[in-house]
Amino acid sequence: MFAVIKTGGKQYRIVANQVVKVEKVIGNAGDVVEFNDVLMVGQEGSAVIGTPVVADARVTAEILEQARGRKVIAFKKRRRQNSKRTRGHRQEFTTLRVLEILMGGSKPKKAAAKPIKEEATAAKGTKDTAVEKKAEKTAEKKTASQKKAAVASKSKKD
């Protein structure tokens, strides 16, 4: 069974257990991602073509690594103007291993990662606790009137 998926503005023909390099996908090594933009699913002799995507078709894949490609140099020069500009660029990509191609609402063998929205709210929660800790520290500091009283008591003792 093969499938054609769309990710990163490109289309890839994939089969199960294939290792493929695609444009950067959010996630860490070892995470399982799911692609819902399946344009075509086929087997020997038959194929289902989506309009634009195949309904209830999904592809699950495991992230093997997040890396950057080789450097591409962009060089501009204007002759006789003493003007030149050099820029370098390294494109980020993700290496994936396709786990399985699912049709008709079947469930994946390995659970996919949680949606990004839930992770973002969890990250915001850690910021709130940090702000509360700062607020507690500032509350412990002495006020100006307390400092004057402390200085006055020291001078009376001397």
From Swiss-Prot:
Skewed-composition ranges (Low complexity): 146-158
Gene Ontology molecular-function annotations: rRNA binding; structural constituent of ribosome
InterPro entries in UniProt: bL21-like (IPR028909), bL21-like_sf (IPR036164), Ribosomal_bL21 (IPR001787)
Pfam family, one: Ribosomal_L21p
Keyword Ribosomal protein: yes
Family named by the database record: Belongs to the bacterial ribosomal protein bL21 family.
Protein name: Large ribosomal subunit protein bL21
Species assigned in the record: Bartonella tribocorum (strain CIP 105476 / IBS 506)
Gene that specifies this protein: rplU
